[in-house]
Regions:
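Gly/Pro/Ser/Thr-rich low-complexity, intrinsically disordered segments predominantly at protein N-termini
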Residues: 1-185
């Protein structure tokens, strides 16, 4: 491995990733996270369908895998759902500017839950990402973080799946989490 954050990004680009995993840089390490379970697609589609009408002007909402880079924090994340100004995506680089994000959502897995609820909360909040939504699939609850500041997020609201959760500005809408649970059986 080469030195520093830029070296880690280069190493990540050259990494041969096993099928079923995606690489991220978390806590100064290259971490392989599993691809989502099949039913996560249903949940992601419901989130996108509800938020799309409330997107800030000129922004795009997507589930395409992209690596958003936060050089100051030496982190690079590949969120499950992301929204950013269209200009953020207008690059030939695979490393997108994390500070261009207006919304991020992560659906936790057993292996990613801790980082989704700690490291990513801190990095997204300090970077100024207006809204970070964590769908805690293990605890069947939705957690939304808002009001980013240099200290991190100032607000946090939690609702169990099946209830409605307010998504703060720049969206200013309500997310219905009915049907976010895993299929039975």
């Amino acid at each position: 491995m080469r030195g520093g954050f830029e070296g880690m990004l280069d190493d990540l680009d050259e990494l041969r990733v096993p099928a079923g995993y995606k690489p991220e840089i978390i806590g100064g390490n290259i971490v392989l996270s599993p691809w989502p379970k099949g039913f996560y697609t249903r949940v992601m589609r419901r989130v996108c369908g509800q938020l799309e009408p409330y997107l800030p002007g000129g922004h795009l909402l997507d589930r395409t895998p992209h690596l958003f880079v936060f050089p100051g924090a030496e982190r690079a994340f590949g969120p499950d759902i992301h929204a950013a100004h269209a200009q953020t995506y207008e690059t030939d680089s695979v490393h997108l500017d994390g500070e261009g994000l207006s919304f991020v959502a992560e659906l936790t897995s057993v292996s990613t839950r801790s980082g989704d609820l700690t490291d990513k909360v801190e990095v997204y909040g300090k970077a100024g990402v207006p809204v970070y939504l964590v769908l805690d699939m293990q605890q069947e609850q939705a957690i939304v973080f808002g009001s980013p500041s240099p200290r991190g997020y100032e607000t946090r609201f939690t609702k169990p799946f099946g209830e409605k959760l307010y998504i703060p500005d720049p969206f200013g809408c309500t997310l219905d989490t009915t049907g976010f649970q895993a299929p039975q059986g």
